[in-house]
């Protein structure tokens, strides 16, 4: 059997990490089995769907490296196909028109709640006579179209993640609405469950891979596949992504969309890697840092967990830091440029080679790309504010003297690491202090703090940027004070 899977997001918001994780699993399964990965945009919710959300979804999937083989297909362009399926169900007696008003349905629900019963439609219009239908139409009532569900029916399937799943027809809430309310004799806008099934039949989807929150929909959809005379695909219901409290990750948890992660400085390789680990366990001997292409050679549902997957920021941060370390200096500079630009840093004033040296220096300490703004600030600033630990160091005996020696020996030409090492040795000897005093005093003067990246490399970069001399002069003045 040819594997054909799909991802079918609704453009009612930006690409959510849960939808993106589902896309990753679908993509991996398709690539593992040399199948097709199809993109479908379920945009029939006209009130909430927005073109900017569609753009965000497409851009997000591309950013993650999830290339699709067919699509994107848009449900709003396929309404005639859905209405034809609804008509087929009406003609075969498997669907009917229901004229209940919203007030009548709400009264039904209220009475059920009063009896501590789960709200459900009681199928009261399932077998209307032509005369009854005519009477409702004469009142000007519009009708939804409902699909008949036998309460005694057992719906079962072997799920690729959850093994055997069984639902009773009586647990599905009564006959299901498959088309919105419309005037007599017409078919209103088809609804989610009907449209999804028609699309999956038309696109010959072999495996439906989605979150476990769709299990109840699957039971309803299996009945629709059968009623339309189509083969039922295989299903895999993946675990939900949970927050640290064990509840489903939602917008209330803050960062949930792929564009949010992108703006925070996470790289697509890290996000895709981490999403694969959200519910899937690598094969024995496989490192947790892997590419999508590597995962696609071994991915299957035998290693997908049933239990919900808790979102672990520490794991994501570690993966992101590893991906950053894998980048070449030129690649990293290109990735960092948008974050420098957003922070108002004019990198055009600095040579490309200097920026690459800076990225090489700071890259190993970055967890996200946004970290570069704070960590690189002292290299772009025209002056620095001395922190308390730096002020204390500059007050140490010998600090002023060794800085004076370094300042006087500074070359007018480019400073190299070898020259910098020699200058330090000469300065501490001339000032009569230990090398540790010289190094700590130089750090305080150049960086304004006793913490920071490699001192000598930082010195070389600051000298090249024309900042070493004025900082030494300012530190000497502070030490005098």
UniProtKB/Swiss-Prot annotation:
Location in the cell: Cytoplasm
Chief subcellular location: cytoplasm
GO biological process: glutamyl-tRNA aminoacylation
Motif 'HIGH' region per record, residues: 9-19
Entry coiled-coil feature ranges: none
Cofactor or coenzyme needed: Zn(2+)
Sites where the protein binds Zn(2+): 98, 100, 125, 127
Residue span of motif 'KMSKS' region: 248-252
GO molecular function: ATP binding; glutamate-tRNA ligase activity; tRNA binding; zinc ion binding
Cofactor remark from the record: Binds 1 zinc ion per subunit.
Keywords: Aminoacyl-tRNA synthetase, ATP-binding, Cytoplasm, Ligase, Metal-binding, Nucleotide-binding, Protein biosynthesis, Zinc
InterPro entries membership: aa-tRNA-synth_I_cd-bd, aa-tRNA-synth_I_codon-bd_sub2, aa-tRNA-synth_I_CS, aa_tRNA-synth_I_cd-bd_sf, Glu-tRNA-ligase_bac/mito, Glu-tRNA-synth_I_codon-bd_sub1, Glu/Gln-tRNA-synth, Glu/Gln-tRNA-synth_Ib_cat-dom
SUPFAM superfamilies linked to this entry: An anticodon-binding domain of class I aminoacyl-tRNA synthetases, Nucleotidylyl transferase
CDD domains: GluRS_core
UniProt EC number: 6.1.1.17
PANTHER family reported in the protein's UniProt record: GLUTAMATE--TRNA LIGASE, GLUTAMATE--TRNA LIGASE, MITOCHONDRIAL-RELATED
Assigned protein family: Belongs to the class-I aminoacyl-tRNA synthetase family. Glutamate--tRNA ligase type 1 subfamily.
Subunit details: Monomer.
Protein name (Swiss-Prot/TrEMBL): Glutamate--tRNA ligase
Protein species of origin: Synechococcus elongatus (strain ATCC 33912 / PCC 7942 / FACHB-805)
């Amino acid at each position: 059997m040819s594997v054909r899977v799909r991802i079918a997001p609704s453009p009612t918001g930006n690409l959510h990490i849960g939808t993106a994780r589902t896309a990753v699993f679908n993509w991996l399964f398709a690539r593992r089995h040399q199948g097709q990965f199809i993109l479908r945009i379920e945009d029939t919710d006209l009130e909430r769907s927005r073109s900017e959300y569609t753009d965000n979804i497409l851009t997000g999937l591309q950013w993650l490296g999830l290339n699709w083989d067919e699509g994107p297909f848009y449900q709003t362009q396929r309404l005639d196909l859905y209405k034809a399926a609804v008509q087929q169900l009406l003609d075969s007696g498997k669907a009917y028109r229901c004229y209940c008003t919203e007030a009548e349905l709400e009264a039904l629900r209220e009475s059920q709640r009063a009896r501590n019963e789960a709200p459900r439609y009681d199928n009261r219009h399932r077998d209307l006579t032509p005369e009854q239908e005519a009477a409702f139409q004469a009142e000007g009532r519009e009708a939804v179209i409902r699909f008949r569900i036998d309460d005694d029916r057992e719906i079962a399937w072997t799920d690729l993640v959850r093994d055997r799943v069984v639902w009773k027809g009586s647990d599905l809430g009564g006959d299901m609405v498959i088309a919105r309310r419309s005037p007599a004799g017409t078919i209103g806008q088809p609804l989610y469950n009907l449209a999804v099934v028609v699309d999956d039949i038309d696109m010959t989807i072999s495996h439906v891979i989605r979150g476990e929150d769709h299990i109840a929909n699957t039971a309803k959809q299996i009945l629709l596949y059968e009623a339309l005379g189509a083969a039922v695909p295989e299903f895999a219901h993946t675990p939900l992504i949970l927050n640290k409290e064990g509840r489903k990750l939602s917008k209330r948890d803050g960062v949930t969309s792929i564009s949010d992660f992108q703006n925070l400085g996470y790289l697509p390789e890290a996000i895709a890697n981490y999403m694969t680990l959200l519910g899937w366990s690598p094969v024995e001997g496989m490192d947790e840092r892997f590419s999508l292409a590597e995962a696609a050679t071994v991915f299957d549902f035998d290693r997908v967990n049933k239990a919900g997957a808790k979102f672990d920021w520490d794991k994501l941060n570690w993966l992101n830091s590893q991906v950053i370390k894998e980048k070449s200096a030129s690649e990293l500079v290109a990735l960092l440029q948008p974050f420098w630009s957003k922070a108002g840093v004019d990198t055009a004033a600095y040579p490309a080679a200097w920026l690459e040296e800076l990225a090489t220096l700071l890259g190993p300490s970055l967890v996200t790309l946004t970290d570069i703004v704070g960590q690189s600030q002292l290299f772009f600033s025209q002056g620095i504010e001395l922190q308390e630990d730096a002020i204390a160091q500059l007050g140490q005996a010998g600090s002023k003297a060794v800085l004076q020696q370094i300042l006087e020996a500074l070359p007018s030409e480019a400073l190299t690491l070898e020259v910098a090492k020699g200058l330090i040795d000469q300065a501490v000897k001339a000032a009569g202090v230990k090398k540790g005093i010289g190094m700590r005093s130089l750090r305080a003067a150049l960086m304004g703090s006793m913490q920071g990246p490699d001192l000598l490399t930082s010195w070389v970069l600051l000298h090249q940027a024309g900042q070493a001399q004025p900082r030494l002069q300012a530190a000497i003045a502070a030490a005098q004070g």
